[in-house]
Amino acid sequence: MCNVSISTNNLTIGYNNHIVQRDLNFELQAGEMVCMLGPNGCGKSTLLRTLAGLQPAIGGTFTISNSLIEASQIALVLTERLSIENTTVHDVVAMGRYPYTSFLGGLSGRDEQIIEQSLSNVGLSGCSHTFFNDHSDGEKQRVLIAKALTQETPIILLDEPTAHLDLPNRIRILQMLRRVAREQGKTILISTHELDLAIQLSDRIMLMTPQKGIQLDTATNLRATGAFTAAFGMDIFNPCL
């Protein structure tokens, strides 16, 4: 991987002038899935919301391919248990195409192809005309990821996409996201507490600690330097704990 997708320069993040992390400098590559780990309150969700444009940076800059980031370049999937009454899976996923539709909001043949392909990518082919609320939490999460895929953005940010899911669905979703990153050349950044799965499945780990910035490296290298132990205050690889 050699194509830089996201690059930050002394990025400082927070809210209401309260600084959560300062002077963050990192680069993410096209075609990789990065899992962001760290203790609660260290700024993981704040970073995602800042990159997505939902809240302003306090200082510094961040770019995509050396250009200032635009909302149309990023898809964001937040953690939430949605209940959408009387709405089909197709209609939920189609919301991701609305920025590209005609003035009247009509879907073109290409839009429909993208919707079906996105559902196929998340393993939900044939579910277009089923109702969203009839699906399990894991399936709903995959529908929302399919919606993000239909936006055709080079970057997808996900905040705790496996929350509330059982282990098989957690594994399935992370494996699917890694495959999408590699096959479609997307940059996927995930905030998660799934330490074991992140270490096994991500290309790199972004390890964040309160007020101390981030370390971005492979899980093997971070373990070798003791970074995980320093971040979480204990030897997370000790089977006796």
What residue spans do the PLM features occupy?
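H-loop/switch region of ABC-family ATPase nucleotide-binding domains
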Residues: 192-193
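The feature captures the beta-strand-to-loop junction immediately N-terminal to the Walker
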Residues: 37-39
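Catalytic Walker B motif of ABC-type/P-loop ATPase nucleotide-binding domains
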Residues: 156-159
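Conserved ABC ATPase signature
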Residues: 131-135
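Conserved ABC ATPase "signature" region
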Residues: 94, 109-127
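Conserved structural motif at the start of ABC-family nucleotide-binding domains
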Residues: 6, 20-23
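Helix-to-loop junction immediately C-terminal to a conserved catalytic motif
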Residues: 52
